[in-house]
């Protein structure tokens, strides 16, 4: 998505050779008008697919999933929770995922009420780095005996293993921007 690449170059910043910060428009402050363009693009990429629910992981994926939902007939948005919560049902699907950004492993959970057998689920998230979050969500979908339509990623770090890992697991991956490298403050796209 050319407009996304241009926005990253214009408004993003880098830290080291592996961190791309897009907090000015995607995951801290949100440019809702631009997020609508992202939602439209995901609809185009997954055109013709039946999507019953949009699935993500807290927290940065929630805003993206909510906008994307509007382009899939307002499909409900479900997000896996990383933290313990007194108001989360005890009857949950659960798996462990490693977060590249936080450099730690999380137990993520989703209530069995919200992912159901036979449903067609589209995963969306802001970043793909090592692919563990997406594979964790895929595991939750499989536990529920639901169907994974695919994974929609706003920004894939192509220099990390996530994309290859998802493809090796027969996951349809649609990344709107793939960063080939971050070198000396310069972002290069695939």
From Swiss-Prot:
Reaction equations catalysed: XMP + diphosphate = xanthine + 5-phospho-alpha-D-ribose 1-diphosphate
GO molecular function list: xanthine phosphoribosyltransferase activity
Entry binding sites for xanthine: 20, 27, 157
Assigned EC number: 2.4.2.22
Lineage: superkingdom: Bacteria
GO CC annotation terms, alphabetical: cytoplasm
Record carries keyword Transferase: yes
Family matches, as InterPro entries: PRibTrfase_dom, PRTase-like, Pur/Pyrimidine_PRTase, Xanthine_PRibTrfase
Keyword Transferase attached: yes
Principal location: cytoplasm
Binding site for 5-phospho-alpha-D-ribose 1-diphosphate: 129-133
Any one Gene Ontology BP term: xanthine metabolic process
Protein name from the UniProt record: Xanthine phosphoribosyltransferase
Species name: Clostridioides difficile (strain 630) (Peptoclostridium difficile)
